[in-house]
Every structure is written in C-alpha cells, then in structure tokens.
Amino acid sequence: MAEKESTSPHLIVPILLLVGWIVGCIIVIYIVFF
C-alpha cells in the first residue's frame, strides 16, 4: 500500500507534464494553421 502511495505522485507529475506539453503543441499548431 505504501509503495503505491509513493509511486502514484511520481507517475502523476510526468504524466501531467506530458499532457500539458502535448496540449501546448496542439495549441501552437492550431494557432499556426489558423
């Protein structure tokens, strides 16, 4: 149980960064093309 609690925040942070980076790229592409 303790291992899952310690690893889940470790996984959430990179996932949020990846999602934010992808969304940012999509916004930039959308602005460039439109």
UniProtKB/Swiss-Prot annotation:
Family matches, as InterPro entries: DWORF (IPR044529)
Location of the protein in the cell: Sarcoplasmic reticulum membrane
TM segment ranges: 12-32
Phenotype upon loss of function: Mice produce offspring at expected Mendelian ratios. Slow-twitch skeletal muscle fibers display delayed Ca(2+) clearance and relaxation and reduced SERCA activity. No significant differences are observed in peak muscle force and no differences are observed in relaxation rates at low, non-tetanic stimulation frequencies. However at tetanus-inducing frequencies, relaxation rates are significantly slowed after tetanus.
GO molecular function: enzyme activator activity
Entry keyword set: Membrane, Sarcoplasmic reticulum, Transmembrane, Transmembrane helix
GO cellular component, one term: sarcoplasmic reticulum
Subunit-level organization: Homooligomer. Can also form heterooligomers with other sarcoplasmic/endoplasmic reticulum calcium ATPase (SERCA) regulators ARLN, ERLN, PLN and SLN. Monomer. Interacts with ATP2A1/SERCA1; the interaction results in activation of ATP2A1. Interacts as a monomer with ATP2A2/SERCA2; the interaction results in activation of ATP2A2.
Protein name: Sarcoplasmic/endoplasmic reticulum calcium ATPase regulator DWORF
Chain's gene name: Strit1
